Design a protein with these regions (language model features):
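Conserved hydrolase catalytic core segment
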Residues: 1-33
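Short, hydrophobic alpha-helix immediately C-terminal to the catalytic nucleophile
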Residues: 11-15, 125, 155, 159
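A short beta-to-alpha transition loop/helix N-cap that caps and shapes the active-site region
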Residues: 30-37, 61
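Conserved alpha/beta-hydrolase catalytic His-Asp/Glu region
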Residues: 44-106
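Short beta-strand/loop motif that positions the catalytic acidic residue
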Residues: 104, 110-112, 116
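Short alpha-helix in the alpha/beta-hydrolase fold that links the catalytic acid
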Residues: 106, 120-129
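Catalytic active-site module of serine/aspartate enzymes centered on a nucleophile-bearing elbow/loop
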Residues: 134-167
Length: 167
């Protein structure tokens, strides 16, 4: 299970270790078109800027609670965390998976926010067309993090899909 850059990491793991992965769930995943970092965090010391950037991730900006904004603010201002995140993002840009996906036979659920502005819906459609054993599910009124914005619906889709394929 992976969201955003985590989805890309999960896809890479499934590519290199298919025998270890019975099923894969991706949401808002990078791997085709890289905008997961947006325009970055040029004003990372500016709390109001970080709050605004955090709110952009969600369809409903109120989901970006103070706790979430504080966590993002701390992460982008922690030099080690920021460098690791940037390294992962740069790796994602270098490892476009469009040519790999048609050969990946792992059963995959693609759960996507219908209003995702970070990895837009057309990316989900392309993942679905390239992954031969994939199912695409939409969550309406939802941005880039459906498991946070609509956790009950996300879990309902996920567990139903897992049950359907005995995963």
């Amino acid at each position: 299970l992976g969201n955003s850059l985590g989805g890309h990491i999960a896809l890479l793991y499934a590519k290199f270790h298919p025998e270890m992965v019975k099923g894969l769930i991706i949401t808002g995943s990078s791997g085709l078109y890289e905008n997961a970092m947006g325009d970055g965090y040029p004003k990372r010391g500016d709390y109001d800027y970080i709050r605004a950037k955090s709110e952009e991730v969600f369809y409903d900006p109120k989901v970006a609670t103070k706790e979430i904004v504080d966590e993002v603010f701390d992460s982008v201002n922690d030099r080690n965390k920021l460098l690791r995140t940037l390294a992962i993002a740069k790796s994602a840009i270098r490892h476009n998976m469009a040519k790999d996906l048609p050969n990946m036979l792992t059963r995959t659920a693609i759960i996507w926010g219908a209003q995702d502005g970070v990895t837009p819906p057309n990316v989900a459609v392309e993942f679905n067309s390239l992954l031969p054993n994939s199912d695409l599910y939409w969550i309406d009124k939802c941005g880039h993090a459906p498991m946070m914005e609509h956790p009950d619906r996300f879990n309902e889709i996920m567990f139903s899909w897992m049950e359907q394929y005995k995963l």
